[in-house]
Curated annotation (Swiss-Prot):
GO molecular function: 2 iron, 2 sulfur cluster binding; dihydroxy-acid dehydratase activity; magnesium ion binding
Domain of life: Bacteria
InterPro entries per record: Dihydro-acid_dehy_C, DihydroxyA_deHydtase, DiOHA_6PGluconate_deHydtase_CS, ILV_EDD_C, ILV_EDD_N, IlvD/EDD_N
SUPFAM superfamilies registered for this protein in UniProt: IlvD/EDD N-terminal domain-like, LeuD/IlvD-like
Organism, as annotated: Nocardia farcinica (strain IFM 10152)
Residues binding Mg(2+), per UniProt: 82, 124-125, 493
Cofactor(s), names only, from the UniProt record: [2Fe-2S] cluster; Mg(2+)
Protein name in the entry: Dihydroxy-acid dehydratase 2
Pathway(s) served: Amino-acid biosynthesis; L-isoleucine biosynthesis; L-isoleucine from 2-oxobutanoate: step 3/4; Amino-acid biosynthesis; L-valine biosynthesis; L-valine from pyruvate: step 3/4
UniProt-listed Enzyme Commission number(s): 4.2.1.9
Keywords, ordered alphabetically: 2Fe-2S, Amino-acid biosynthesis, Branched-chain amino acid biosynthesis, Iron, Iron-sulfur, Lyase, Magnesium, Metal-binding
Amino acid sequence: MPELRSRTVTHGRNMAGARALMRASGVPAADIGAKPVVAVANSFTEFVPGHTHLQPVGRIVGDAIRRAGGIPREFNTIAVDDGIAMGHQGMLYSLPSRDLIADSIEYMVQAHCADALVCISNCDKITPGMLLAAMRLDIPTVFVSGGPMEGGRATLADGTVRRLDLITAMSEAVNDATSDADLATIEENACPTCGSCAGMFTANSMNCLVEALGLALPGNGTTLATHTARRDLYEAAGATIMAITRRYYDRDDATVLPRAIASRAAFDNAMALDLAMGGSTNTVLHLLAAAHEAGLDYTLADIEKRSRAVPCLCKVAPNGSHLMEDVHRAGGIPAILGELRRGGHLHTTVRAVHSESLDGWLAEWDVRGPNPAQAAVDLFHAAPGGVRSATAFSQSARWAALDLDAESGCIRDVAHAYSEDGGLAVLRGNLAVDGAVVKSAGVPADLHVFTGEAVVAESQEEAVTAVLSGRVRPGTVLVIRYEGPRGGPGMQEMLYPTAYLKGRGLAGSVAVVTDGRFSGGSSGLSIGHVSPEAAAGGTIAAVTDGDPITIDIPSRTLRLEVDDAEIARRLAHRRRTGYRPRSRHRPLSTALRAYALLAQSADKGGVRRLPPDELGGPEAAFDTQTRAG
């Protein structure tokens, strides 16, 4: 039997000081050494609406752990709000914060010898950072998120009633046809409650994917932050972590550990879900990074193969009119997985923290199945309250009926899919030798094949200026480079350029190609993650104004239509003078420079490139050798 990790600090005469400190922190003497210590990694902050309500959540989870016989020890991580950090120097810190979060959890868990972990996450880089930590540590772990916010609704001056989200406010801000009065109304109502932004943006995409990976309970990704059903989820998470902790330490059952649950097959299932629901392109970056931490040989090529086979079953904002509350009403993630299972697109023997197999838990939680549990039916009736509130589980509204329409409802079946291939596509070609990613679900059909002349910007700021000044016209391919993990550094999201294109009426006639990334709220012909990035000597560094570029999503190609010899000549010149932007002044802190020194391109998940393991580093400490799954 594996010993409790916490015995390192709770047993032995030499640990009298550690035990004294545990008593001083409120642990009863009788519990020290007798009960497992569960680290509760919270991410409460008043900066982020997706996290403002998490302060009491840590206490609820902790109380559930205590009732089940554990010792909860809560601590906090940082949480960057990408929406507030967007469009200025702050966005440079977003992706690097993922690694900082992962490292901080590792530091706390390892320094205090915790036996298990609960991750209370919600927004863009927090769930991925916690996922990296869970894969790295490989101790019993359960994820539970803060939940999505309710969708906004507003009546405009002309009497039109609109459903709103954050992206509406951003795009309408640069739409000259939108009056100041209407913009003020939109701004006031776009984000009416606490929770992660209401569409299928990065935060909600990742919270849904941890359900598919098997590390969270059903309903984690779609139950609204304001609903009382969310409180039940927190209490269940506390009980679940204690159940799997006992299975591991008392019964030597290693099948409950994160790497056993999040196997290669589970990552494949998560990617299938992502493709079916048209999730954020950022999920590709984060799943690749998490697989790397798990020691799995799961690459962009695997995602590319999956993208050609899995159909798109769901279109949620920004790809369509539905919001997360609509996905929940239609049965949530279990319903999407159920449709994929019936279509033969899932590995069904994978485990979860709450079930021995995917088949087993879908039989209970898929409300479209023949005999769903009453608990599932009740959960997916949870509806928005329609009242402005920053308070968690403050309302208990219910839908009159579920959306079980598999032909034209929020979640379709395979026979009525939006497309036969998924909502994301991996493109390759001389402009992206190692790959690029596009959210194809958000691209109008008439833009799936596009050729245009390049307008080159060497920063997001320069790209915004190009759009607002009229330099970008219909038929343009706006190339934004030196914004990759190393070149930015930090791989900024290009939400403002795409939002401004939309606001200026250019989203249907302009493509954007970048080695940076896009917000989960981006739509249109937006191709990101171009690898190798410009700072790593990728072909994108050789593009000049006026070069023709061809994008062919059906053929999965991205080409710079310039002679190979000319490309080689330009890159050779760049090598001599250095792969760096010529027209950008961007002062960098020590923290950002350190990140840039280690960051790899997006096709590797933006993970850190470390020197050979001469000191018995992470590979030795956590046994992260590559495994087949």
